[in-house]
UniProtKB/Swiss-Prot annotation:
<dbReference type="GO" id="GO:0005829">
    <property type="term" value="C:cytosol"/>
</dbReference>
<comment type="similarity">
    <text>Belongs to the XPO2/CSE1 family.</text>
</comment>
<keyword id="KW-0813">Transport</keyword>
<dbReference type="InterPro" id="IPR001494">
    <property type="entry name" value="Importin-beta_N"/>
</dbReference>
<dbReference type="GO" id="GO:0005049">
    <property type="term" value="F:nuclear export signal receptor activity"/>
</dbReference>
<feature type="domain" description="Importin N-terminal">
    <location>
        <begin position="29"/>
        <end position="104"/>
    </location>
</feature>
<keyword id="KW-0653">Protein transport</keyword>
<keyword id="KW-0963">Cytoplasm</keyword>
<dbReference type="GO" id="GO:0006606">
    <property type="term" value="P:protein import into nucleus"/>
</dbReference>
<dbReference type="GO" id="GO:0031267">
    <property type="term" value="F:small GTPase binding"/>
</dbReference>
<comment type="function">
    <text>Export receptor for importin alpha. Mediates importin-alpha re-export from the nucleus to the cytoplasm after import substrates have been released into the nucleoplasm.</text>
</comment>
<dbReference type="InterPro" id="IPR005043">
    <property type="entry name" value="XPO2_C"/>
</dbReference>
<dbReference type="Pfam" id="PF03810">
    <property type="entry name" value="IBN_N"/>
</dbReference>
<dbReference type="InterPro" id="IPR013713">
    <property type="entry name" value="XPO2_central"/>
</dbReference>
<keyword id="KW-0539">Nucleus</keyword>
<dbReference type="GO" id="GO:0006611">
    <property type="term" value="P:protein export from nucleus"/>
</dbReference>
<dbReference type="Pfam" id="PF08506">
    <property type="entry name" value="Cse1"/>
</dbReference>
Amino acid sequence: MELPKETIEQLQNLFIAANRPEKEIREEATSKIQKFVKETPNSIITLLVFQNLKTIDAGARTLSAITFKNLVKDSWVDGDEVENPIPSNDKEMVKSLLLNFILSAVNNTTQSQLVESLSMIGVSDFPQQWPSILPELIKQMESNTDIPTLSIILRVLHSLLKKYRGQERNNQSLSELKYILSILPTPYLSLLIKTGVAVDANLQNEQQLVLLLNCVHFLLEIFFSMSSVDLPEFFEDNLASFTNEFHRYLKFNTNFQSIILSSNDEEPSLLKKIQTSICEIINLYTQIYDEEFSSFLQPFVQVVWGLLTQTSKDICNDPFVYASIRFLGTVATSISHKIFESPETLKQICSMIVTPNIELRESDIELYEDNHVEYMRRDIEGSDSDTRRRAAIELVKGLRKYYENQVIQLLSVDINNLLQKYNSNREENWICKDSAIFLVTALAVKSGGSDESSESSKLVNVLDFFKSSIEPELSGATQTNKPILKADCLKFITIFRNQIPAEEYPRILQSVIPCLENPDFIIHTYASTCIDRLLSVKDGGVPRLSAEFISTNLTGLLLPLVGVFNFKDSKQNERAMRTIVRIVLMTQGKVSQQITIQLLQKFVSIIIEEAKNPSNHSFNHYCFEVVGTLLKGFSSEPEVTQIIMPLIEMVLQTNNAEFSPYCFQLLSILVENCRPEYLDLFRPILPIIFNDMTWARDADYPALVRLLQAFIKKEGSSIAPHLSAILGITEKLIMRVTHDHEAFLILETVVETLDIQFLEKYLGGIFSMILTRITKKKTLKVVRCFTIFFSIFMIKYGVVKTAQTVRAIKDSLWEDILIKLWLPTVEDINGSIEKKIISISLTNMICCNDILATPELWIKLIQCQSNVISGKKSQETEQAGAASDLYIDQAEANEGYVPTFTQLQFSKKVDVDPFPTISNPKEYFISTFQTFKSQNEMLVTPLLSTANIQL
């Protein structure tokens, strides 16, 4: 495909402008690029071809490749939420071009973007909708003698197959792999062996050896992917050949620094990457295919053990150390666990592998001092999953499966030795106590993670260790000033909080609260987390620290927590804020208006400061959660409103994209609970709501809709002059597949609130608007929303009026809606209020003489009502319910932060029953129907018999 010269120039200019430092120029160009992508036919092909042109600007090429990748990510898979799906012809063209463009890519950056794109396409299309790609890759793999090109081919193959890692073993994955394994393994093994021969032949050729070993690395990654779901029969039959190749690289020796040394302090060397991949493979086979692999296991254990004891403590070796220790841990729990059964072997594992890899390194201490956020992530947030410490702890857990008593005895000796060494010189040997705490944790924990409450082993006395080694450290009795130890102790309490008796909790709090005033980021953050977790512990559903206890000690808890934000590094400490959220929730309704006002003033001031430069989105969310929760209790008080309004005004005036969804929610709470005499304060907001610019951001839609609903309900008939503007908003929303349900929320509120005379002139337009949307893009969601709205309309204004309104648009439309849309959907409606609405509307139709005049329709309605009130589903409805499972919201990762609506979980709008006078829809039906039947006995009784309904 050849691009017109003007298209090339247009795109080049746009992409160059989109890379400019000037914000206005950059944003305008980005907007035009997005418009081009959405509105130009074949835009995905144009982008792909454009980035492959040799003459274009390098920055434009890169941005074009990124735009192509993002378009694939957002629009390749069809679905209700995809507003601009890619035509199937364009998809086929992309798939026919992509591999060649990857191989001919001008630079590594664009090549990487294209490989990522291919991987995403492969997730949905390979192999069923893309059968040509694998034979083409195999052909290239077998015929290509150029090692750099072969490396690219293997990289592509790896990206295509990695989707099977972690995939469930089901019919689809097995069917796909059956096809793949029918054509790939033989040429794959041939290439693996051939590459091994080439490696041996080039032991003195550094440049060629590096290229070959890069290929080996991809080959190993491919092997892992092909083995992840099920053991391929070919692999099982040829395990001897494969394991010979694995041993080749585990035993590989060379002096070439480009192979054995890393390019930086954190990146593993090429050889270590290969050996890590092998450890991951043999771990997988030991874990899942242990019977088939057991005869090959012993030599791997020996060689991996040997490599592990020879590997330095450098950070760059951590992935290998983790993978190798994990492999040994898997062996310890496998059918081959007797490899470790001798006391001497267990002793060596504990003393030579576990304890040394538990020990803090200088790099860990530097991380604590220089990058406390990253240290915390590794230590308590689970991102330490591939560290030496984590691997050592997992190895201990694995060994305990068969050798718990022996391992506890062996490591208890190490723990005592470490504590003795610490006590002999606490200043010099404090790392020993850190190791001891970690070892006790490794021995004591039976389940749970590093940041969660854990079940503990009965063979380890957690409470004794807490009293002898943890509590004194926190209380200051040990007279050491090592912040890492204090952090360890706080984490220990957090992990074993369930094992510490309830009567200890008040004293623990007295030791933990002072840590909130420690300027060390880790310490006051861990203290916040510790308090949060202690507050969460319940016995028989009852919190150990009751709401009454918290209320009594509210000032002593909240003031130090709020004080955390005064520290330079903790102005946005989300863990402290999360703890405050929990306390505010626990004490909801128990805090006086005076304290509420003081807290609101504090948190509103924090948000106003944050609004100047929002950066920590989680912190900001928690802060708004606190304000929203506090606001609920006293939202009708003018003094409270006066505190909140300056924040709302500032956010609206500065057009703060991140905070506006929150502020509209706060406004909604104020309006929903406003006393009539104070409503004038909020009426100036209405013109803002009706301004098109207010609806410029999707993120604001849900909160704006809630706010508009609040005004409609509060104003009642006074809102009628604004109906045209309100319906203009609903028309905009209803045409958006992601926001159509919000249009119906507005329409339902209008119908529930206003009498028919206010709506009369708009009714035809409302139904035409809805039906136009359904005709253009019919989805289950929009039909369900319409079904609920239609039911509310009938209940409020009557069945006859509804029929007249719809027939005024088209005479046959009433029956068409009921038979083709409404009836097939009603039984698939979920939610107690929604089901009640459906049942009431069915009752009203069944008991309507106009409906009775159409016997076939009446029979369908009575059968449907029978199913609704009995809880049954028709066959069609069950099928529709299964189909609805396909409509899954996909949260896409964005390039950079894009504000999205974030619901304040603890200030949600409560679902309100629009028809509270009817408490039981079944009883309502029975009583209403009996009256109707008695008046129409001659007509109803035969129809009931025909419908096979007994009432």
